[in-house]
Regions:
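Catalytic phosphate/nucleotide-handling subdomain of diverse soluble enzymes
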Residues: 1-11, 67, 71-134
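Accessory "access/gating" subregions that flank catalytic or transport cores
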Residues: 10-93
C-alpha cells in the first residue's frame, strides 16, 4: 500500500494538484486499505518542525516500508524543490536510494522536468553509453 501511495502522489502531482500529500489524505482518509498510510502521513506531518536527520533516524533509515516512505514524506514536506529535497535525503544517510528515487519522481512530477538541475543531468551517463561499454 505504501508503494501504491507513491504512485497516487505522483499521479496527483502530474494532474496539477498543488499539494498532492494533502489531496491524498483528503481522498483516502475513509479508505480502510490506506488507513495506516494516512495515519503515518499525519504522524510525519507532526514531525515537520524536527530536523530531517533526527526524523529519519526515528522514522526509519532502511529501505523497508513504512520507514522509507515516512522518511521520504518528511523530506518532501520540508523541501520546496527537487535539489533541496535530494540533497537533504542523501545527507540523512541510510538507504537513501530508496527514498531519493521517489522524492525525485515526486518533485519532477510536481514542478516539471526543469526542476532537475541541468548540471546534474550533464554529469549523468546515459544507460545506452553504460551498456555499450561491455
Amino acid at each position: 500500500k505504501y508503494a501504491l501511495t507513491k504512485f497516487h502522489l505522483i499521479d496527483l502531482a502530474l494532474k496539477g494538484s498543488k499539494n498532492p500529500i494533502n489531496e491524498f489524505i483528503k481522498q483516502f482518509k475513509k479508505d480502510s486499505y490506506f488507513k495506516s498510510v494516512v495515519d503515518d502521513i499525519k504522524k510525519v506531518k507532526r514531525l515537520k518542525s524536527k530536523s530531517h536527520l533526527k526524523s529519519v533516524k526515528k522514522l526509519g533509515m532502511a529501505c523497508s516500508y513504512p520507514g522509507t516512505f515516512n522518511s521520504s514524506i518528511h523530506s518532501i514536506i520540508n523541501s520546496t524543490n527537487y535539489k533541496g529535497a535530494i540533497l537533504k535525503t542523501i545527507k540523512a544517510g541510510g538507504c537513501n536510494c530508496s527514498r531519493v528515487n521517489f522524492i525525485g519522481a515526486y518533485f519532477a512530477a510536481l514542478k516539471g522536468i526543469n526542476t532537475i538541475p541541468k548540471s546534474w543531468i550533464r554529469k549523468t551517463d546515459s544507460a545506452k553509453k553504460i551498456l555499450d561499454q561491455n
